[in-house]
Regions:
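Acidic, histidine-bearing metal-coordination/catalytic regions of metal-dependent phosphoesterases
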Residues: 1-65, 70-79
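Acidic/histidine-rich helix-loop elements
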Residues: 37-41, 69-84, 106-116, 142-146, ...
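Beta-strand-turn-beta hairpins that frame and shape the catalytic cleft
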Residues: 45, 54-66, 159-160, 167-179, ...
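Active-site-proximal beta-strand elements of phosphoester/diester hydrolases
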Residues: 63-76, 175-184, 205-209, 263-269
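Active-site neighborhood of phospho(di)ester-bond hydrolases with catalytic His/Asp-centered motifs
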Residues: 67-70, 98-104, 133-140, 162-165, ...
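Core catalytic region of metal-dependent phosphoesterases/phosphodiesterases
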Residues: 79-170
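Binuclear metal-dependent hydrolase catalytic cores centered on His/Asp/Glu-rich metal-binding motifs
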Residues: 152-159, 163-165, 171-208, 212-216, ...
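Conserved beta-sheet core of the metallophosphoesterase superfamily
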Residues: 156, 211-292
Length: 296
């Protein structure tokens, strides 16, 4: 039944895409040359830099710099290993204090690419060093591939996996917690309990694969980083996002969200799944400079 439903969903998405690209305003606005140019442009990664002032966070001498990569889907394109090396080089040049990986390292739908072993991916990611370390969670593709193999590969290369786990660290003599909420491997009740147990006073970064968990973030000095949606992966002019792949509200598909006095950032990720292309949603490296909110 699940396989049948996936096929039905895939036909619906393909149908919507076909109808969209054969009618105005899409066809009239871009034309054939513009269509190809936009596809080419949308495959090149961008560096997304943000400065966040978070209520309840320390007034550090300088902001805590966090680099965030998610949804690599290595193998969704034939040149992904070369691209991943270039991305790691670009992130290293930004000198992050902390590096976080949001899951879906492997790709289970390798149209035009191929399967890349987790150890190859982890070896490349391990070249990216940071004073506070590198930490990861798993995504749905990693669980389909085999969670144990992906975890072993990451941890073999010095990248701890925080699936349903917490890690404490210190930055400029202030404590910070890091909590991981994976895409699977835990019950919904366990995830609720993990989030409910966050300190109401201690600054916490919650690393989640799916932004749906932002709805359950308790009151406190916390912010969440998530992926999974690919920012929609395809955002057509005059039509918008074709598919979000999450039960989270559509407004949580991509970018910075501020609700209830708390922040969520949902990255568009790096790779693709399903169709091996992006449109209007380029892959991105996310770099956040975080600090305490200035008192007025």
């Amino acid at each position: 039944m699940q396989q049948y439903m996936r096929k039905v969903a895939g036909r619906r998405v393909r149908g919507r895409l076909t109808r969209a690209i054969t009618r105005p305003p899409f066809h009239d606005e871009l034309g054939r040359k513009g269509w190809l140019a936009e596809i080419s442009r949308a495959q090149r990664h961008v560096i997304r830099r943000l400065h966040l002032e978070i209520a309840g966070w320390p007034q550090w001498r300088r902001p805590l710099r966090v680099a965030f990569l998610s949804d690599l889907h290595t193998g969704s394109h034939s040149d992904d290993v070369v691209r991943l090396n270039a991305i790691v080089h670009d992130v290293a040049a930004l000198a992050p204090d902390l590096v976080l990986y949001g899951g879906d390292y492997v790709n289970m739908q390798p149209f035009g690419g191929g399967r890349v072993p987790p150890r190859t991916i982890a070896a490349i990611l391990s070249r990216l060093e940071a004073p506070l370390g590198r930490f990861a969670i798993l995504g749905n593709h990693d669980y389909v591939y085999g969670a144990r193999a992906v975890i072993d590969a990451l941890e073999h290369h010095g990248i701890p996996v925080l699936d349903h786990a917490r890690r404490s660290m210190r930055f400029q003599n202030h404590a910070i917690d890091l909590v991981g909420v994976p895409d699977a491997g835990m019950t919904r009740a366990e995830a609720y309990a993990l989030l409910a147990g966050l300190s109401a006073e201690r600054p916490t970064i919650v690393l989640a694969h799916d932004p749906v968990w932002f709805a359950h973030l308790p009151t406190g000095p916390h912010f969440m980083l998530a992926g999974h949606t690919h920012g929609g992966q395809i955002r057509l002019p005059g039509i918008g996002i074709i598919r979000t792949a999450t039960k989270a509200p559509r407004r949580w598909t991509h970018g910075l969200v501020e609700e209830r006095g708390q922040y969520l950032y949902v990255t568009s990720g790096i790779g693709t799944s399903g169709l091996p292309l992006r449109w209007g949603v380029p892959p991105e490296i996310v770099v956040l400079d975080t600090a305490g909110k200035q008192r007025t």
